[in-house]
């Protein structure tokens, strides 16, 4: 739960779920909602894949998924796992043996698709490998690849069909006394995804992996994911998320964190609050924010920064942020620290000065956290 006793209307009450482990990352229960992404390199290109995994981890990814379409990819996975700073999920479709090979290669989790993994006997083989090698499993239902008997029964991909697919495979895992699993019921349609996720959340206590599949490019996919995932998270549904974009995986991680930050569910780095700018702005807000986003990427400490072009809303927004800058006149503006007006600063020096103030505040917050942990 994101707890705010002063403003209870900001609280999000998370659905109670079992906790499993994906490598060293807890998923479900009271664990923080983890952020995932997926590589888009050829898995057999180990150097490129490892570089992408490391970049995603640096951006904050807790878990990274890698596709394992063939034997060569399964062989490459062993080295990728060895070089990865975060747990690796092996994405398995069609060939159940790839799941067995991925478990042997050290994958922390196996994603299997009920629509194409094959018979229950094949699933049992994957379960055995997962148990032997300490892997968890994600049952990854997708509207675009539902089982034939469910499409015949329901006529089209629908929430009921997706939930039934997921529950059928949960039963297979449970019948084999395997409980380290999570589930997803993804679709590219926001309405279908939301309804399916609500259905599966009511039907099981398994940890839920949230995603809108094939969401689109950076802008359209971000909007679709923010609406779909944001609404479900606000309802308390979701234990780990992956934003699917036709873009660099690092962008998926950034968008994922922004969605969580907007709901107060997880915080990482500087949350910049800025105005869209208008004729009243005392400096170029858009260019300033673009520059600050790049200059402050290295800050991992959760904190807030307001950049407002004029005094209409600037002082009020600054009251609620760690550092703030409000445009004034005559080529300068007011710097706010801890919600209070502190000193004036010229527009010319403003960006460098704000970076200094943010770094100073981040260091102070880190020191306070370290001291508290040492008590």
UniProtKB/Swiss-Prot annotation:
Its EC number is 1.17.7.3. Its cofactor is [4Fe-4S] cluster. Binds 1 [4Fe-4S] cluster. It comes from the Bacteria. One of its GO terms (molecular function) is 4 iron, 4 sulfur cluster binding. It catalyses: (2E)-4-hydroxy-3-methylbut-2-enyl diphosphate + oxidized [flavodoxin] + H2O + 2 H(+) = 2-C-methyl-D-erythritol 2,4-cyclic diphosphate + reduced [flavodoxin]. Keywords: 4Fe-4S, Iron, Iron-sulfur, Isoprene biosynthesis, Metal-binding, Oxidoreductase. [4Fe-4S] cluster binds at residues 275, 278, 310, 317. Pathway: Isoprenoid biosynthesis; isopentenyl diphosphate biosynthesis via DXP pathway; isopentenyl diphosphate from 1-deoxy-D-xylulose 5-phosphate: step 5/6. Belongs to the IspG family. This is 4-hydroxy-3-methylbut-2-en-1-yl diphosphate synthase (flavodoxin). It comes from Ruegeria pomeroyi (strain ATCC 700808 / DSM 15171 / DSS-3) (Silicibacter pomeroyi). The lineage of its organism: Bacteria, Pseudomonadati, Pseudomonadota, Alphaproteobacteria, Rhodobacterales. The gene is ispG.
